[in-house]
A protein has these predicted regions:
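A structural "domain/chain start" motif
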Residues: 22-63, 150
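Short acidic low-complexity segments
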Residues: 66-76
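Amphipathic beta-strand/beta-sheet edge segments enriched in Tyr/Trp
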Residues: 74-128
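Structural motif
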Residues: 91-93, 152-157, 197-201, 241-245, ...
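Residue-level detector of Asp-centered blade-edge/turn motifs that repeat once per structural unit
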Residues: 138-140, 183-184, 227-228, 270-272, ...
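Residue position within the beta-strands of beta-propeller blades
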Residues: 144-147, 187-191, 231-235, 275-278, ...
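Multi-bladed beta-propeller domains
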Residues: 160-177, 203-221, 226, 247-265, ...
Length: 399
């Protein structure tokens, strides 16, 4: 069997080797911007709300690696104040203000929310502050999905980006692999081994409704959503060796995109509808690109003898991947505009990268836990989970 399929199989076995995790996550920022971040004073919110809104905002901003939250009595570049009081039509009115060092008002907004939405609105405030001061969309209000296993079961889990509010949306006595979010964040496609054979399933996140979209003989693997959310690309071996197929979700018949004697697998879509995938057609696993309907493949990677598990940033600018060097595995990124190739991580067991919806962070697993690193390598986060977690995927922004 080809080398990278051997590694794929070994990683499959590892998924089931950890103890049961109840998906309790905490996140440590292990590397931030030089200088410790932008000082920002955050005062406790008045009004006696059950959630510590100021504390959530401070944690969110600290986790970005770009801010250094301070107590309100410390001189800082920016200051956040607010109130969360019973009232309004939904239960609570939350107001906040962001001011500059000279007292200039930068933001002054209010939200009418039910009591169970105080934490989400705190994340919303964090993202508004982050975007106002950096020019980039924030990630505090987003979600992640991942797989964990133990006790003879596998779990597909969704949690907030800060690791809170984990929810198991699927429990199975057979492996679960390769979750992928739909572009609107309402569905997850994944590989399930129910019935002791691989099949590709699409599950509605909010209702739990499930639909098997491919259960062909042999391999059914690595589902990836098209940008319009109406198609999936995945790997099938029903006609012999693994090839890339595309399926219109309104049709039962997948269309074959690659055709040859090589192993073609792990497809992901670019915004223009073309597909990047892993193939050993050149003698070792490398990344290639084909058009929306297939055709001639263009090789994209030439650094080293192993580049696999591609993931594409939302704007198509970057492709992150697993890069092998000296028998160890790292996360690397290829700039599609400049063709610059950079290795971002220093560990040796990196796997399964996916981009955050703002394209600035990449989440991945390292064999024990989840990690995230910025595209420029300047910010690194460790997700501390009780037990092992694999196959992380960052959800898109809510629409």
């Amino acid at each position: 069997m080809k080398a990278f399929l051997k590694i794929f199989g070994a990683l499959m076995l590892l998924v089931g080797s950890g103890s049961l995790a109840h998906a309790e996550l905490t996140i440590d920022v292990t590397k931030g911007i030089q200088g410790g971040g932008i000082p920002i004073a955050i005062a406790p919110f008045a009004g006696g709300a059950s959630e510590n809104i100021a504390g959530i905002i401070a944690s969110d901003l600290k986790r970005t690696g770009k801010f250094a939250p301070q107590s309100p009595d410390v001189r800082a570049d920016y200051a956040v104040t607010g109130q969360a009081s019973p009232g309004g039509s939904r239960g609570y009115v939350v107001r906040f203000q962001l001011a500059g060092a000279q007292g200039s008002q930068l933001l002054n907004l209010s939200f009418d929310v039910p009591p169970n939405q105080l934490r989400p609105v705190a994340h919303r405030i964090s993202d508004l502050i982050y975007e106002k001061l950096t020019g980039e969309k924030g990630l505090s209000g987003t979600r992640i999905a991942f797989v964990t296993a133990g006790g003879g079961s596998w779990f597909l889990v969704i949690a907030d980006a800060d690791g809170q509010n984990p929810k198991v949306i699927l429990r199975s006595t057979q492996p679960i692999m390769s979750p992928a979010w739909s572009p609107d964040g309402s569905r997850l496609a994944y590989v399930s081994f129910e019935g002791r054979r691989p099949q590709i399933v699409v599950q509605e996140v909010y209702t739990g409704a499930r639909r098997t979209v491919s259960a062909a003989p042999g391999i059914n693997g690595a589902p990836s959503w098209a940008p319009n959310g109406q198609r999936l690309a995945f790997t099938l071996s029903k006609d012999g060796n693994p090839e890339i197929y595309s399926l219109d979700l309104g049709s039962p018949n997948p269309v074959r995109l690659t055709n040859g004697s090589a192993i073609d697998t792990e497809p992901v879509w670019l915004p223009d509808g073309s597909v990047v995938f892993t193939s050993d057609r050149g003698g070792s696993p490398q990344l290639y690109r084909i058009g929306p309907g297939g055709g001639a493949a263009q090789r994209l990677t030439f650094e080293g003898s192993y580049n696999a598990k591609p993931t594409v940033s939302p704007d198509g600018r970057y492709i992150a991947m697993v890069h092998q060097r000296n028998s160890r595995f790292y996360i690397a990124v290829l700039d599609m505009k400049t063709r610059q190739f950079r290795v971002l991580t220093s560990g040796g067991l990196a796997d399964s990268p996916t981009f955050a919806p703002n394209g600035r962070m990449i989440i991945y697993s390292d064999g024990q836990r989840l990690n995230a690193i910025s595209v420029d390598g300047g910010v690194k986060q460790d997700f501390v989970l009780r037990g092992r977690a694999r196959d992380p995927v960052w959800a898109p922004y809510s629409r």
